[in-house]
């Protein structure tokens, strides 16, 4: 009887020692796995370019304030930049590899090769019909010309702002502008716009609705026309529809991914005087006219400062942007 009890006790002790050994072995294995994982994290962390949530987050002030977590000091590595310039720049530079040179110069400012696109245009009037603002950031170089000053001003107003536009059937309907932010935009190869104001009884004021030669002419053979008339008055409109389209538009606000640089001129064009421009700020600046290489050097040198005045857009813009809300 005592032999059976001794055997049972011995078996229990052996199982207890074996269980203790197994638990210690599992603990050592878990410690090894944990320390190996921590070592891997320590080694890999310097090479990971991820967001550090909670790092440098202020603990004072309003909790409603939005804070941006960015661990990458180069915000332009994933952005595209379009630089629009008059075709005469290529003629003056006369170097087949000048774009490659400019690309390398942009690289010194943090813009990778392939992220900057150089696009030429024939003249301001033609460019205004279809600007094609496709990049995240768009900078337009406009050489000052006293004869096209009004065209430059209208183009700047067009591309620096967003417009909500609808087609107009001027053959059937009268139209009026109910506020300062609502204007009519005409685009085409040749736009001649005429208007005939009407009173509350739809009777003409100083013109004959059946005779377009008596209409007041507000634009003659232009490619871009932004027409502003007296608010609250109906108008009969006449436009050369074969070469021009007209739309009823409302200025929504600034298009913040576009900037205009005026090249030359004694003063910079100012579109903020327009009461429809709100807020009263503009992304327009001037570079003294010298040579086109000097102009491009200046743009490259200050490109990042210029971009800081703009906001990146995640979608491309083209001519349809002026016709539909974006």
Swiss-Prot record:
Q: Where in the cell is it found?
A: Virion; Host endoplasmic reticulum lumen
Q: What else is known?
A: Some rotavirus strains are neuraminidase-sensitive and require sialic acid to attach to the cell surface. Some rotavirus strains are integrin-dependent. Some rotavirus strains depend on ganglioside for their entry into the host cell. Hsp70 also seems to be involved in the entry of some strains.
Q: What is its main location?
A: virion
CNP motif: region residues: 165-167
Name the residues that bind Ca(2+) 1: 95, 206, 214, 216
Quaternary data:
Homotrimer; disulfide-linked. 2 Ca(2+) ions bound at each subunit interface in the trimer hold the trimer together. Interacts with the intermediate capsid protein VP6. Interacts with the outer capsid protein VP5*.
Q: Which residues form the signal peptide?
A: 1-50
UniProt-annotated binding residues for Ca(2+) 2: 177, 228-229, 231, 301
Which residues bear sugar attachments?
69, 238
Task: Please give the positions of the paired cysteines in each disulfide bond.
Answer: 82-135, 165-249, 191-244, 196-207
Residue ranges of region GPR motif?
253-255
The UniProt PTM text for this protein says:
N-glycosylated.
- Read off the Gene3D superfamilies from this record: Glycoprotein VP7, domain 1 (3.40.50.11130), Rotavirus outer-layer protein VP7, domain 2 (2.60.120.800)
The entry assigns this protein to a family as follows:
Belongs to the rotavirus VP7 family.
ATP-binding is among the record's keywords: no
* CC terms in the record's Gene Ontology section: host cell endoplasmic reticulum lumen; T=13 icosahedral viral capsid; viral outer capsid
Drop me one GO molecular function for this one: metal ion binding
Main function: Calcium-binding protein that interacts with rotavirus cell receptors once the initial attachment by VP4 has been achieved. Rotavirus attachment and entry into the host cell probably involves multiple sequential contacts between the outer capsid proteins VP4 and VP7, and the cell receptors. Following entry into the host cell, low intracellular or intravesicular Ca(2+) concentration probably causes the calcium-stabilized VP7 trimers to dissociate from the virion. This step is probably necessary for the membrane-disrupting entry step and the release of VP4, which is locked onto the virion by VP7.
Q: What is this protein called?
A: Outer capsid glycoprotein VP7
Q: Which UniProt keywords apply?
A: Calcium, Capsid protein, Disulfide bond, Glycoprotein, Host endoplasmic reticulum, Host-virus interaction, Metal-binding, Outer capsid protein, Signal, T=13 icosahedral capsid protein, Virion
């Amino acid at each position: 009887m005592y032999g059976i009890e001794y055997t049972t006790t011995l078996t229990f002790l052996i199982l207890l020692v074996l269980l203790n050994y197994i638990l210690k072995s599992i603990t050592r294995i878990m410690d090894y796995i944990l320390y190996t994982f921590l070592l891997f994290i320590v080694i890999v962390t310097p090479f990971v370019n991820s967001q550090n949530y909670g790092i440098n987050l202020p603990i004072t002030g309003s909790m409603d304030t939005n804070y941006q977590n960015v661990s990458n000091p180069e915000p332009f590595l994933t952005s595209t930049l379009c630089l629009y310039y008059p075709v005469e720049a290529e003629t003056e530079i006369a170097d087949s590899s000048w774009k490659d040179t400019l690309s390398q110069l942009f690289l010194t400012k943090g813009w990778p090769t392939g992220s900057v696109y150089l696009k030429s245009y024939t003249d301001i009037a033609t460019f205004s019909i279809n600007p094609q603002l496709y990049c995240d950031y768009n900078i337009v170089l406009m050489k000052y010309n006293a004869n096209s000053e009004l065209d430059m001003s209208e183009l700047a107003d067009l591309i620096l702002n967003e417009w909500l536009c609808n087609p107009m059937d001027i053959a059937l309907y009268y139209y009026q502008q109910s506020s300062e932010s609502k204007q009519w935009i005409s685009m085409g190869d040749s736009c001649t716009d005429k208007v005939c104001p009407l009173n509350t009884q739809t009777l003409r004021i100083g013109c004959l609705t059946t005779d377009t030669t008596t209409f007041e002419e507000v634009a003659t053979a232009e490619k871009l026309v932004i027409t502003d008339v007296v608010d609250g008055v109906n108008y009969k409109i006449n436009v050369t529809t074969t070469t021009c389209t007209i739309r009823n538009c409302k200025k929504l606000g600034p298009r913040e991914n576009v900037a205009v640089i005026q090249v030359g001129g004694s003063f910079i064009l100012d579109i903020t005087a327009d009461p429809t421009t709100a807020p009263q700020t503009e992304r327009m600046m001037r570079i003294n006219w010298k040579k086109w290489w000097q102009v491009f050097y200046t743009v490259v040198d200050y490109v990042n400062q210029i971009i800081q005045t703009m906001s990146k857009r995640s979608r491309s813009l083209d001519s349809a942007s002026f016709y539909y809300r974006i």
